[in-house]
């Protein structure tokens, strides 16, 4: 391999890693995408090291190494950029793009930004939906009373999912799937709670539904699963329990210690921790089953 070509491959690989890291991709995804792109372009191997503010990448070809480093500046979560970069890497792997085309495509990428007023409106509407999901009255929520329980449960889970998907700059075509996954996940948890399943297990199974559907959609639309799943799990975040724990701590500090306040604080904190744990494991399970390269044991 010619030295100049390897240098060009190194530059495009580090640019790929930098774009992914800047816009909120996981470190594992960043490293894997850079390695896959380099191998697809003909180098023997790619080594990538990430720090909080830099990317260091080395390509190896014909016993010749080239190392480069780039400073990382966080540009906020933008799943549109992550998805577009992944599609470019996949296109190179399928021999649809050569080095020059891949470089040009990466240079042409622009972060998706939704209209700020639309984001503000959807976040406000999302907060109203959270109020309803937390047993707020109809005046606060400002919605119709004629919907069936499960239908408006799905609706009020879908609204905040879309609102936060806009915050995360999810690709426009993925917005409807974020809403659908949020609706299906939350209504699954509601049904499981209705049959007296503990909220931790209900949340875990509901998050698994979102996770598996997210993996399916990622294969179908060549996007990262988190483009569909991260916003969808937002309605199940235990904000009320966390708020109660915080308020109890403030009251203990202000009014002094009491058994009732301490019990409420510990109970709310434990509920928050276990529900968050259920969400994390439920969302990680599909990845462990479908993407892991080595056996767990």
UniProtKB/Swiss-Prot annotation:
Q: A single GO BP annotation from the record?
A: succinate transport
Could you name the Gene Ontology cellular component terms for this entry? Answer: plasma membrane
Provide the membrane topology annotation. Answer: Multi-pass membrane protein
- Keywords recorded for this protein, A-Z: Cell inner membrane, Cell membrane, Membrane, Transmembrane, Transmembrane helix
Q: Which residues form the signal peptide?
A: none
Chain ranges passing through the membrane:
114-136, 150-170, 197-217, 227-247, 269-289
User: Record's superkingdom?
Assistant: Bacteria
| Keyword field contains Ribosomal protein | no
Q: Which InterPro entries match?
A: ThrE-like_N (IPR010619), ThrE_2 (IPR024528), ThrE_Dicarb/AminoAcid_Exp (IPR050539)
Q: Where in the cell is it found?
A: Cell inner membrane
Single GO molecular-function term? Answer: transmembrane transporter activity
Which PANTHER family does the entry mention? SUCCINATE TRANSPORTER SUBUNIT YJJB-RELATED, UPF0442 PROTEIN YJJB-RELATED
Q: Which family does it belong to?
A: Belongs to the ThrE exporter (TC 2.A.79) family.
What is the protein's name according to its record?
Answer: Uncharacterized protein HI_0108
